[in-house]
């Protein structure tokens, strides 16, 4: 059997860590697109998230999971886009220089 890192317990723990940090973004629908697709579609509007992308959730979860002694050493990423912006904001929110 395959062992996945994500399970219900880890998802709930991440949700607790993100409470008050990440925006609760809306889920929207569009009747026109539903008709065209022949089914009901839902759109999670992560463009309303901090830094304008879903990447903030993962970066924030990772930064706030770090032990204090690890966080004190700082964080680094190889990105020039949404992930870099998300990590920088999450680190700032945690007080990591």
Show the residue positions of the predicted features.
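PLP-dependent amino-acid enzyme catalytic core
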Residues: 1-97
């Amino acid at each position: 059997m395959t062992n996945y890192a994500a399970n219900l317990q880890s998802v709930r723990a991440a949700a607790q860590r993100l409470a008050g940090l990440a925006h609760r973004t809306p889920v929207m629908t569009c009747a026109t697109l539903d008709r065209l697709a022949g089914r009901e579609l839902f759109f999670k509007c992560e463009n309303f998230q901090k830094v304008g992308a879903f990447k903030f959730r993962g970066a924030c979860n990772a930064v706030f999971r770090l032990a204090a002694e690890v966080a004190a050493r700082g964080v680094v990423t190889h990105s020039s886009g949404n992930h870099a912006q998300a990590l920088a904001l999450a680190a700032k929110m945690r007080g990591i220089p």
